[in-house]
């Protein structure tokens, strides 16, 4: 079998659990083929690395990296760390039956709450997201010390929910910020040119902040 040595199971047999990941290979291949043959590139959205590298000079690029690490980084880090923490602290509970609910809620809340940022503003929503995360963290600590798994899981589900809201709100902030910053930083650009430049920088910042925030999957489980 591919993927390494087998693991023993309870019945005394062998299990190649690591091979379960190969179930995604056909879907990845199909998606890649559909993208290659079916998607159309937008010509005016192309930008070289040199053109995109201007974002490293933008203060708000680094600020958004920090904020998005707090939201998406927390989401992906909690997804990796929650089962480990729950299993260590509540060994008598079959945590795998329940912990999947938290990331599911976070994923749904990201998709379902984007309108909130559009209506009230991404910055305002992000502020309250971090307040909610602080409240959720205190709740987790409280129920962890009390040995209450139900309360512990409920607080984590709440934190996943607000991180999902924050994932949407921080991304909503990026184009808004750049549409304001580019005309100020590059006054020589006319209206349409400034808009295109803001769109290019926004797209680059979205990609870069996502890459940085993904490190949450590494350092949050390490904290446990």
Can you say where each PLM-predicted feature lies in the sequence?
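Hydrophobic core of transmembrane alpha-helices in multi-pass small-molecule transporters
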Residues: 150-167
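C-terminal ends and interior cores of transmembrane alpha-helices
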Residues: 131-147
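Intracellular juxtamembrane helix-capping segments at the cytosolic ends
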Residues: 165-193
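Juxtamembrane intracellular "pre-TM" segments in multi-pass secondary transporters
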Residues: 40-65
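Cytoplasmic membrane-interface "Motif A"-like loop-to-helix N-cap segments
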Residues: 118-131
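C-terminal membrane-cytosol helix-exit motif in multi-pass small-molecule transporters
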Residues: 24-45
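A late C-terminal transmembrane helix in Major Facilitator Superfamily
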Residues: 188-224
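Extracytoplasmic gate region of multi-pass secondary transporters
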Residues: 58-107, 167, 171-172, 220-221
């Amino acid at each position: 079998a591919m993927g390494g040595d087998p693991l023993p199971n309870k019945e005394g047999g062998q299990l190649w659990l690591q091979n379960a990941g190969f179930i995604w290979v056909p879907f990845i291949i199909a998606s890649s083929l559909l993208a290659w043959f079916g998607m159309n590139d937008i010509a005016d959205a192309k930008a070289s690395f040199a053109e995109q590298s201007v974002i490293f000079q933008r203060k708000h690029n680094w600020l958004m990296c920090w904020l998005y690490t707090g939201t998406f980084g927390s989401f992906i880090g909690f997804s990796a760390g929650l089962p480990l923490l729950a299993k260590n602290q509540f060994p008598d509970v079959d945590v795998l039956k329940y912990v999947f609910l938290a990331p599911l809620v976070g994923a749904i809340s990201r998709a379902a709450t984007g309108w909130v940022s559009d209506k009230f503003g991404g910055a305002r929503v992000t502020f309250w997201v971090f307040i909610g995360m602080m409240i959720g963290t205190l709740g987790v600590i409280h129920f962890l010390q009390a040995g209450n798994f139900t309360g512990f899981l409920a607080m984590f589900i709440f934190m996943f929910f607000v991180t999902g809201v924050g994932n949407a709100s921080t991304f909503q902030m990026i184009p808004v910020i750049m549409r304001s910053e580019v005309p100020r930083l590059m006054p020589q650009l006319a209206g349409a040119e400034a808009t295109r430049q803001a769109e290019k920088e926004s797209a680059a910042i979205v990609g870069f902040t996502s890459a940085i925030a993904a490190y949450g999957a590494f350092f949050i489980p390490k904290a446990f």
